[in-house]
Amino acid sequence: MLIRIHEILTGSSANGPGIRNVVWFQGCTLNCPGCFNPQTHDPEDGKLITSDDLCEQLLSPGAPCDGITVSGGEPFQQPEGLLALLKELRKRNAPPVLVFSGYTYAQLLGDPARRACLPFMDALICGPYDKNAPPAYDRFCSSANQELYILSGRLKKENFAGLPLSEVIIDGDGNAILSGIRLF
């Protein structure tokens, strides 16, 4: 299954509990004002990768991690690709998977293709970013209207309190990557 992605980052400490390998899906039509990742919105940008190859990169022996984070863009706007990735991660006994979404939980439950993804993730942070709402750092949410859902026994709500909120990583080409959740 092909997935359009924006970026892969390994060794992140500001995208969920522990050291995480992160993928940002490409494409989002939600257009939340003040979005932290506007560069991920264009559905024609980014690059195509198979779910198997993406899984290989996220679980690379050269990039050990405590968890996988899927962000965007909007991962649920590619529900078939997201489901293929989540199933492959589960099949390979990946560490806990956290997914970020701008959809509400009710919206995800209301769409069969999106709902099918939920059993294959360990935690979900969802809801549209609201630049006028204060952050809820105790549950790792950029705006207080967003919710954290624990979907398996592999993570707990307490795992999301006190996390680093942002980081700057210099990649192999010398580019600075700002990552994490919106602080302003």
Language model: regions and residue ranges:
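Short, charged low-complexity linear segments at domain edges
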Residues: M1-I19
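Short gly/ser/thr-rich secondary-structure transition/capping motifs
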Residues: I5-H6, Y105-D111
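Canonical Radical SAM [4Fe-4S] cluster-binding loop centered on the CxxxCxxC motif
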Residues: S13-T50
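Core AdoMet radical
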Residues: N37-I49, A63-Q78, A94-L108, L118-N132, ...
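Alpha-helical scaffolding segments of alpha/beta enzyme cores, especially the outer helices
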Residues: D53-E56, G81-E88, A116
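P-loop/Walker A phosphate-binding loop and immediately adjacent motor/lid segment at beta-alpha junctions
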Residues: Q78-R90, P134-S179
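Accessory C-terminal segments flanking Radical SAM cores
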Residues: R182-F184
